[in-house]
Amino acid sequence: MPQENIARRAFISSVTALTAASYSRVLGANDAVQLGVIGPGERGRFVMSQFMMNPKLQVAALCDVYSEQIDKAKQKATAAKTFTDHRKLLEMKELDAVLIATPDHWHARIAIDALNAGKDVYVEKPLTRTIAEGPEIVKACRINERVCQVGMQQRSGIHYLRAKAEYIDTGKLGKITLARTWWHGNGYHLRKAPDSLRDKPSNLDWAHFLGPVKWRDWDPQQYWNWRAYLDFGGGQVTDLFTHWIDVVHMFMGQEIPKGASAAGGVFAYKDGRTAPDTINVLLEYPTDFTATFEATLVPGITGAAIEMCGTEGRLWIDRSRYEWHPKGRNAPPVIVQAEAHDMTLDHVNNFLECVKTRKRPNADVLIGHRSAQASHLGNIAYLERRKIDFDPQREEILPF
């Protein structure tokens, strides 16, 4: 057995070593939130920078399996302690909260460990890699009375909330029967590993990176572009559709599909990836509407957006603006531009406010579970090549 495999088995067997004891401290209105960052890669460092815009926050700890990522984050968080094992970071009693920005296959395990350690959690979407992980995270959050925000920042986006209030809540669209979503040409899923990673760096713990995933020898592409491999995430469906279906859920007040269908494959980029480069997902909801997702890594349509289609018109929205198109061939549209800043800052500030007030955040853990669950159903339909029937009450896939 390879030495790395032995190390990995030992690591996995000890993952449950954390106790459920709460290390949380009571924060006063003027106390600085002490934050630990787990996974300070490219996205993690950006979200960390949004946290650091709050003067009442200090990044007290950094953790990553690759010390180069820690070194880059340390340039901003100069006083932070550093770790390569998240469990050691969670032993810090002074920590109030953690930001989890690891690859998707680690989200659930680290989130549960953090919640059981008494930390509030901001975790990047998707919350889970499997449907089964969702209820476990929700349970850990509720039992430990923690705040858990999932990084679906549209929930805090001002123009999304305005569009909902003006056109959805007022009923101006009439009966909504279709929510169309699409995301074309996302280059992040086409990243190529740099030559510097051809051989595994000595300061990168590959066994720890794999964690709950089946052992395989070092593969720079699977490390660098893990989104292209279904062992580590759900491809474009969980990475991109989770954002859009969450907006649909927010608009419609309906979060649990009753059925899912999908079709797609690896049609253009035959580079060893297991996640489809092109996929279409169709979800059916109990309140008589469907939601679709169309994704391809080829250029296709410019950008990504959502279109809510009703009997009285349609609402088109993306991260830069929304457009109201009343029914009628000659009816002029209403176009409203969004404010020129990243919604992640609003989402982070909502989380930090809830850390102080103990209220539930805009993208609470249950909301995150439901949106990830909808995406997972799409992937299951794709992988099993069949229509999935889902019981919205019991949240279970029905037998054939």
PLM regions and their residue ranges:
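Alpha-helix C-terminal capping/helix-to-coil transition sites in glycosyltransferase folds
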Residues: 92-94
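Contiguous beta-strand/loop segments that form the cofactor/metal-binding neighborhood of enzyme cores
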Residues: 146, 161-162, 172-184, 189-227, ...
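Pocket-flanking alpha-helical
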Residues: 45-49, 68-72, 87-88, 108-113, ...
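N-terminal Rossmann-like dinucleotide-binding module
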Residues: 14-77, 154-157, 248
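N-terminal secretory signal peptides and thylakoid transit peptides that target proteins
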Residues: 1-16
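Beta-strand-loop-alpha-helix segment that lines the small-molecule cofactor/substrate pocket
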Residues: 103, 108-156, 171, 385
